[in-house]
Protein backbone atom coordinates (compact mmCIF):
# COMPACT_ATOMS: atom_id res chain seq x y z
CA UNK A 1 0.00 0.00 0.00
CA UNK A 2 1.43 3.37 -1.02
CA UNK A 3 2.38 5.78 1.76
CA UNK A 4 0.41 8.48 -0.06
CA UNK A 5 -2.79 6.46 0.21
CA UNK A 6 -5.17 8.02 2.71
CA UNK A 7 -6.13 5.25 5.10
CA UNK A 8 -9.15 7.10 6.44
CA UNK A 9 -11.02 10.37 6.25
CA UNK A 10 -10.12 13.16 8.64
CA UNK A 11 -12.64 12.20 11.30
CA UNK A 12 -13.41 14.75 13.98
CA UNK A 13 -15.66 14.50 17.01
CA UNK A 14 -18.81 15.61 15.17
CA UNK A 15 -20.15 12.32 13.85
CA UNK A 16 -23.91 11.99 13.57
CA UNK A 17 -26.26 9.04 13.31
CA UNK A 18 -29.74 9.72 11.92
CA UNK A 19 -32.30 6.95 12.51
CA UNK A 20 -35.55 7.15 10.54
CA UNK A 21 -37.90 4.53 12.01
CA UNK A 22 -41.09 4.28 9.94
CA UNK A 23 -42.00 0.69 10.80
CA UNK A 24 -45.18 1.43 12.75
CA UNK A 25 -46.75 2.87 9.62
CA UNK A 26 -47.17 -0.64 8.20
CA UNK A 27 -49.26 -1.72 11.19
CA UNK A 28 -50.47 1.42 12.99
CA UNK A 29 -52.79 -0.55 15.29
CA UNK A 30 -49.71 -2.13 16.87
CA UNK A 31 -48.03 1.17 17.77
CA UNK A 32 -46.92 1.43 21.39
CA UNK A 33 -47.05 4.56 23.55
CA UNK A 34 -43.60 5.75 22.48
CA UNK A 35 -44.50 5.54 18.79
CA UNK A 36 -42.71 2.29 18.02
CA UNK A 37 -43.64 -1.32 17.47
CA UNK A 38 -40.20 -2.75 16.78
CA UNK A 39 -37.24 -1.35 18.70
CA UNK A 40 -34.64 -4.06 18.12
CA UNK A 41 -32.84 -2.48 15.17
CA UNK A 42 -33.19 1.07 16.46
CA UNK A 43 -31.71 0.27 19.86
CA UNK A 44 -28.90 -1.78 18.38
CA UNK A 45 -27.66 0.84 15.90
CA UNK A 46 -27.77 3.57 18.56
CA UNK A 47 -25.76 1.42 20.97
CA UNK A 48 -23.16 0.45 18.35
CA UNK A 49 -22.59 3.88 16.84
CA UNK A 50 -22.56 5.67 20.20
CA UNK A 51 -19.52 3.53 21.06
CA UNK A 52 -17.89 4.85 17.89
CA UNK A 53 -18.43 8.47 18.93
CA UNK A 54 -21.64 9.25 17.04
CA UNK A 55 -24.36 11.59 18.26
CA UNK A 56 -27.77 10.11 17.47
CA UNK A 57 -30.93 11.77 16.16
CA UNK A 58 -34.02 9.54 16.09
CA UNK A 59 -37.22 10.33 14.18
CA UNK A 60 -40.30 8.12 13.94
CA UNK A 61 -43.41 7.95 11.78
CA UNK A 62 -42.67 11.09 9.77
CA UNK A 63 -44.77 12.58 7.01
CA UNK A 64 -43.06 13.38 3.74
CA UNK A 65 -42.92 17.10 4.55
CA UNK A 66 -41.57 16.49 8.06
CA UNK A 67 -38.88 14.17 6.72
CA UNK A 68 -37.73 16.78 4.23
CA UNK A 69 -37.73 19.54 6.84
CA UNK A 70 -35.77 17.54 9.41
CA UNK A 71 -33.02 16.40 7.04
CA UNK A 72 -32.80 19.82 5.40
CA UNK A 73 -32.46 21.45 8.81
CA UNK A 74 -29.67 19.06 9.81
CA UNK A 75 -27.69 19.51 6.61
CA UNK A 76 -28.12 23.24 6.10
CA UNK A 77 -27.48 24.48 9.62
CA UNK A 78 -25.03 22.02 11.15
CA UNK A 79 -23.27 20.22 8.32
CA UNK A 80 -20.08 22.33 8.49
CA UNK A 81 -19.22 20.70 11.81
CA UNK A 82 -19.91 17.13 10.70
CA UNK A 83 -17.03 14.85 9.82
CA UNK A 84 -19.20 11.80 9.09
CA UNK A 85 -22.90 11.02 8.63
CA UNK A 86 -24.63 7.64 8.98
CA UNK A 87 -28.33 7.35 8.14
CA UNK A 88 -30.33 4.24 9.05
CA UNK A 89 -33.81 3.90 7.52
CA UNK A 90 -36.21 1.29 8.90
CA UNK A 91 -39.38 1.05 6.85
CA UNK A 92 -41.93 -1.70 6.20
CA UNK A 93 -44.62 -1.93 3.56
CA UNK A 94 -42.78 0.31 1.08
CA UNK A 95 -42.06 -0.43 -2.58
CA UNK A 96 -38.52 -0.89 -3.85
CA UNK A 97 -36.65 2.40 -3.73
CA UNK A 98 -39.20 4.14 -1.51
CA UNK A 99 -39.56 5.14 2.14
CA UNK A 100 -43.02 4.74 3.63
CA UNK A 101 -44.31 7.95 5.24
CA UNK A 102 -47.37 8.82 7.31
CA UNK A 103 -49.01 10.37 4.26
CA UNK A 104 -47.75 8.15 1.46
CA UNK A 105 -44.20 7.41 0.35
CA UNK A 106 -40.95 9.21 -0.42
CA UNK A 107 -38.41 8.26 -3.09
CA UNK A 108 -35.06 7.15 -1.68
CA UNK A 109 -33.29 9.11 -4.41
CA UNK A 110 -35.02 12.33 -3.37
CA UNK A 111 -34.14 11.67 0.27
CA UNK A 112 -30.45 11.13 -0.49
CA UNK A 113 -30.32 14.23 -2.66
CA UNK A 114 -31.00 16.31 0.47
CA UNK A 115 -27.48 15.43 1.62
CA UNK A 116 -25.91 16.75 -1.59
CA UNK A 117 -24.80 20.11 -0.17
CA UNK A 118 -21.42 21.76 -0.75
CA UNK A 119 -19.82 21.30 2.67
CA UNK A 120 -21.10 17.74 3.06
CA UNK A 121 -20.55 16.45 -0.46
CA UNK A 122 -16.96 15.26 0.07
CA UNK A 123 -17.47 13.94 3.60
CA UNK A 124 -18.07 10.23 4.26
CA UNK A 125 -21.72 9.16 4.33
CA UNK A 126 -23.32 5.76 4.82
CA UNK A 127 -26.98 4.93 4.25
CA UNK A 128 -28.38 1.67 5.65
CA UNK A 129 -31.88 0.91 4.37
CA UNK A 130 -33.80 -2.04 5.82
CA UNK A 131 -37.20 -2.40 4.22
CA UNK A 132 -39.66 -5.29 4.19
CA UNK A 133 -42.84 -5.69 2.22
CA UNK A 134 -44.31 -8.07 4.85
CA UNK A 135 -46.97 -7.54 7.51
CA UNK A 136 -49.27 -10.13 5.92
CA UNK A 137 -49.69 -12.37 8.97
CA UNK A 138 -52.26 -11.43 11.61
CA UNK A 139 -50.65 -10.89 14.99
CA UNK A 140 -53.59 -10.43 17.32
CA UNK A 141 -51.79 -12.55 19.89
CA UNK A 142 -48.96 -10.05 20.30
CA UNK A 143 -48.67 -6.28 20.67
CA UNK A 144 -45.42 -6.19 18.68
CA UNK A 145 -45.85 -5.91 14.92
CA UNK A 146 -42.73 -7.88 14.03
CA UNK A 147 -42.34 -10.40 16.80
CA UNK A 148 -41.31 -13.96 16.04
CA UNK A 149 -43.34 -15.55 18.84
CA UNK A 150 -45.61 -17.27 16.33
CA UNK A 151 -42.68 -19.64 15.83
CA UNK A 152 -40.93 -19.80 19.17
CA UNK A 153 -41.52 -18.78 22.75
CA UNK A 154 -39.51 -15.91 24.22
CA UNK A 155 -37.21 -18.39 25.99
CA UNK A 156 -36.09 -19.78 22.64
CA UNK A 157 -35.36 -16.49 20.89
CA UNK A 158 -31.66 -16.82 21.60
CA UNK A 159 -31.36 -19.34 18.79
CA UNK A 160 -30.76 -16.75 16.07
CA UNK A 161 -29.68 -19.17 13.39
CA UNK A 162 -32.74 -21.36 13.85
CA UNK A 163 -35.11 -18.40 13.76
CA UNK A 164 -33.40 -16.86 10.73
CA UNK A 165 -33.47 -20.15 8.85
CA UNK A 166 -37.22 -20.50 9.44
CA UNK A 167 -37.88 -16.92 8.34
CA UNK A 168 -35.77 -17.46 5.23
CA UNK A 169 -37.83 -20.54 4.40
CA UNK A 170 -41.06 -18.60 4.86
CA UNK A 171 -39.77 -15.96 2.45
CA UNK A 172 -39.29 -18.59 -0.23
CA UNK A 173 -42.70 -20.17 0.38
CA UNK A 174 -44.87 -17.06 0.78
CA UNK A 175 -42.93 -14.43 -1.13
CA UNK A 176 -40.23 -13.89 -3.70
CA UNK A 177 -36.68 -14.41 -2.54
CA UNK A 178 -34.46 -11.36 -2.86
CA UNK A 179 -31.64 -13.73 -3.81
CA UNK A 180 -33.22 -14.49 -7.21
CA UNK A 181 -31.37 -12.94 -10.20
CA UNK A 182 -34.43 -10.99 -11.35
CA UNK A 183 -35.10 -9.40 -7.97
CA UNK A 184 -31.41 -8.78 -7.24
CA UNK A 185 -31.06 -6.93 -10.54
CA UNK A 186 -34.12 -4.86 -9.64
CA UNK A 187 -32.49 -3.87 -6.35
CA UNK A 188 -29.21 -3.02 -8.04
CA UNK A 189 -30.92 -0.93 -10.71
CA UNK A 190 -32.72 0.94 -7.94
CA UNK A 191 -29.46 1.68 -6.17
CA UNK A 192 -27.67 2.82 -9.30
CA UNK A 193 -30.51 5.25 -9.83
CA UNK A 194 -30.62 6.50 -6.26
CA UNK A 195 -26.97 7.33 -5.60
CA UNK A 196 -26.60 11.01 -6.53
CA UNK A 197 -24.16 11.88 -3.74
CA UNK A 198 -20.36 11.49 -3.69
CA UNK A 199 -18.34 9.67 -0.99
CA UNK A 200 -21.29 7.46 -0.15
CA UNK A 201 -21.89 3.84 0.81
CA UNK A 202 -25.42 2.43 0.56
CA UNK A 203 -26.49 -0.86 2.14
CA UNK A 204 -29.95 -1.70 0.81
CA UNK A 205 -31.92 -4.76 1.93
CA UNK A 206 -35.44 -5.30 0.60
CA UNK A 207 -37.23 -8.48 1.62
CA UNK A 208 -40.38 -9.16 -0.38
CA UNK A 209 -41.88 -11.48 2.21
CA UNK A 210 -45.07 -12.07 4.13
CA UNK A 211 -43.22 -12.08 7.44
CA UNK A 212 -41.71 -8.96 8.94
CA UNK A 213 -38.11 -9.17 10.02
CA UNK A 214 -37.24 -7.17 13.11
CA UNK A 215 -37.79 -9.05 16.34
CA UNK A 216 -38.13 -6.61 19.24
CA UNK A 217 -35.09 -8.14 20.93
CA UNK A 218 -32.95 -9.41 18.07
CA UNK A 219 -33.65 -7.11 15.12
CA UNK A 220 -33.25 -7.76 11.39
CA UNK A 221 -30.40 -9.98 10.20
CA UNK A 222 -28.62 -7.24 8.23
CA UNK A 223 -28.68 -4.68 11.05
CA UNK A 224 -27.76 -7.32 13.62
CA UNK A 225 -24.74 -8.61 11.69
CA UNK A 226 -23.55 -5.13 10.67
CA UNK A 227 -23.59 -3.92 14.27
CA UNK A 228 -21.89 -7.10 15.47
CA UNK A 229 -19.09 -6.58 12.94
CA UNK A 230 -18.71 -2.91 13.91
CA UNK A 231 -18.65 -3.80 17.61
CA UNK A 232 -15.71 -6.12 16.92
CA UNK A 233 -13.82 -4.29 14.17
CA UNK A 234 -15.27 -0.76 14.03
CA UNK A 235 -12.22 0.88 15.61
CA UNK A 236 -9.54 -1.32 14.09
CA UNK A 237 -10.42 -1.61 10.40
CA UNK A 238 -12.18 0.25 7.62
CA UNK A 239 -15.93 0.04 7.18
CA UNK A 240 -15.69 -2.11 4.04
CA UNK A 241 -14.15 -4.93 6.08
CA UNK A 242 -17.05 -4.80 8.53
CA UNK A 243 -19.54 -4.80 5.64
CA UNK A 244 -17.84 -7.84 4.12
CA UNK A 245 -18.12 -9.72 7.43
CA UNK A 246 -21.81 -8.78 7.57
CA UNK A 247 -22.37 -10.05 4.02
CA UNK A 248 -20.61 -13.30 4.87
CA UNK A 249 -22.90 -14.03 7.82
CA UNK A 250 -26.15 -12.95 6.12
CA UNK A 251 -25.36 -14.93 2.96
CA UNK A 252 -24.76 -18.04 5.05
CA UNK A 253 -27.77 -17.91 7.36
CA UNK A 254 -30.39 -15.67 5.70
CA UNK A 255 -29.62 -15.39 1.96
CA UNK A 256 -33.09 -13.95 1.27
CA UNK A 257 -32.11 -10.84 3.26
CA UNK A 258 -28.70 -10.35 1.60
CA UNK A 259 -28.44 -6.61 0.85
CA UNK A 260 -27.09 -4.87 -2.20
CA UNK A 261 -24.05 -2.73 -1.33
CA UNK A 262 -23.23 0.21 -3.57
CA UNK A 263 -20.46 2.78 -3.11
CA UNK A 264 -18.68 5.65 -4.83
CA UNK A 265 -15.97 6.37 -2.25
CA UNK A 266 -12.48 7.53 -3.21
CA UNK A 267 -10.95 6.80 0.21
CA UNK A 268 -11.34 4.16 2.87
CA UNK A 269 -14.01 5.02 5.40
CA UNK A 270 -12.63 4.47 8.91
CA UNK A 271 -14.50 5.08 12.17
CA UNK A 272 -11.55 4.41 14.46
CA UNK A 273 -8.91 6.73 15.85
CA UNK A 274 -6.20 6.05 13.26
CA UNK A 275 -4.64 9.32 12.00
CA UNK A 276 -5.04 10.44 8.42
CA UNK A 277 -2.35 9.61 5.82
CA UNK A 278 -1.19 6.56 7.73
CA UNK A 279 -0.33 3.24 6.11
CA UNK A 280 -1.31 0.37 8.43
CA UNK A 281 1.69 -1.48 9.82
CA UNK A 282 2.32 -5.19 9.33
CA UNK A 283 1.35 -5.76 12.96
CA UNK A 284 -1.98 -3.96 12.44
CA UNK A 285 -2.77 -5.99 9.33
CA UNK A 286 -1.85 -9.24 11.12
CA UNK A 287 -4.15 -8.33 14.02
CA UNK A 288 -7.05 -7.69 11.63
CA UNK A 289 -6.41 -11.01 9.82
CA UNK A 290 -6.33 -12.85 13.14
CA UNK A 291 -9.59 -11.25 14.21
CA UNK A 292 -11.34 -12.28 11.00
CA UNK A 293 -9.85 -15.77 11.22
CA UNK A 294 -11.27 -16.26 14.70
CA UNK A 295 -14.78 -15.77 13.31
CA UNK A 296 -14.12 -18.18 10.45
CA UNK A 297 -12.70 -20.77 12.85
CA UNK A 298 -15.82 -20.47 15.00
CA UNK A 299 -17.91 -21.20 11.92
CA UNK A 300 -15.64 -24.11 10.92
CA UNK A 301 -14.76 -22.43 7.62
CA UNK A 302 -10.98 -22.03 8.07
CA UNK A 303 -9.05 -24.98 6.67
CA UNK A 304 -5.71 -26.25 7.97
CA UNK A 305 -3.99 -24.81 4.90
CA UNK A 306 -5.43 -21.39 5.65
CA UNK A 307 -4.15 -21.58 9.21
CA UNK A 308 -0.65 -22.52 8.06
CA UNK A 309 -0.66 -19.66 5.56
CA UNK A 310 -1.75 -17.19 8.24
CA UNK A 311 1.03 -18.40 10.57
CA UNK A 312 3.61 -18.05 7.80
CA UNK A 313 2.54 -14.46 7.14
CA UNK A 314 3.60 -13.52 10.64
UniProtKB/Swiss-Prot annotation:
Domain of life from the UniProt record = Viruses
The cross-references to Pfam families, in alphabetical order and at most eight, read: Peptidase_C14 (PF00656)
One Gene Ontology term of the biological-process aspect is: proteolysis
One example of the protein's molecular function in GO is: cysteine-type endopeptidase activity
* InterPro entries, sorted: Caspase-like_dom_sf, Pept_C14, Pept_C14_caspase, Pept_C14_p20, Pept_C14A
Job of this protein = May be involved in viral replication.
**Which family is annotated?**
Belongs to the peptidase C14A family.
Write the protein's name.
Answer: Caspase-like protein
Q: Which organism is it from?
A: Heliothis virescens ascovirus 3e (HvAV-3e)
Amino acid sequence: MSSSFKFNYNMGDSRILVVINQRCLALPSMMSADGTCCNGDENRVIDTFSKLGFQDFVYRNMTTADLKDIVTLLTRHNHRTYSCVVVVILTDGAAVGEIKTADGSYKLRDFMTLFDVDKLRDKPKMFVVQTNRGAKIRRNHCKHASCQCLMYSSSERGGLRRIYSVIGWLCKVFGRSSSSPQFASQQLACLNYTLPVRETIVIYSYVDAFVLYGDTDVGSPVIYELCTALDKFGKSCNILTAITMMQHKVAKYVPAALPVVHMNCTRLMHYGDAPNDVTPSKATITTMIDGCSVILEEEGELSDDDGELRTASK
